Amino acid sequence: MHTKKAYCSKLVLLISLILGLSIMGAYADSHSDNEAFSAAVKAVKARDYSRALTLFEQQANDAKHDAQYNMAVLLQAGKGRPRNYLDALYWGWLAQLGGIEEAEDIASDILDTLTEDDVKTVRARVGENLQSRLENGDINAISQFADYHLTVLQEPDYSTAYIWYSIAVALNIPDMIDRRDDTEGDIEAKELARLQTEARELFEKYNFAPFNPKEAGGANES
């Protein structure tokens, strides 16, 4: 693990020096992830930002949150493709929901430049991405979907967040108990029974396997 961290840290430093941007590296989940990241680094070093974006995008589409952050950085800067605030916000929000704290600054900056209609469109894209991951049985999307309803929507949806935090707790996903309980405090007592029933129904519908730390993703997953 220490060797892998050192390896990735060196790659992050290299990219940052070349780009002058806050590109982030990952603790790759597999040898193939390491190879993909190395290829992206080589592309950046060669000033082939278009190829770097293509490589990062492949990983970003697989919910690798560091790659999503790198997509946001490059697209915000207009490196490799023309500047695109909509796509940069999309990847930035997904990275933020995946636990990349630095992505919050990118999202905040971009929000100041877009119209509310544009932001609404991106919010919908993010929600669709997370919903698709849930439909595909991605247990890591559960807490992110709950967080989405509190931190990305214009008005927090405490009810939906509570439902998914409740499911997360039932599946032994770490650090979800406090989030569920805190969210419960924002819900009227008359709504609790209905929401708990809905949580049980969704829990049975999706039939996720319980969270297994040994099978969980590395730094790329939340």
Labelled PLM ranges:
Residues 24-55:
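N-terminal leader/linker segments that initiate helical-solenoid repeat arrays
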Residues 36-43, 55, 70-77, 106-113, ...:
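Hydrophobic face of amphipathic alpha-helices that form TPR/SEL1-like repeat modules
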Residues 45-46, 61-62, 75, 79-83, ...:
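Short coil/turn and helix-start
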Residues 33, 117-138, 175-222:
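Terminal, low-structured helical/coil segments at or just beyond the last alpha-helical repeat
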Residues 12-22:
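Bacterial N-terminal signal peptides
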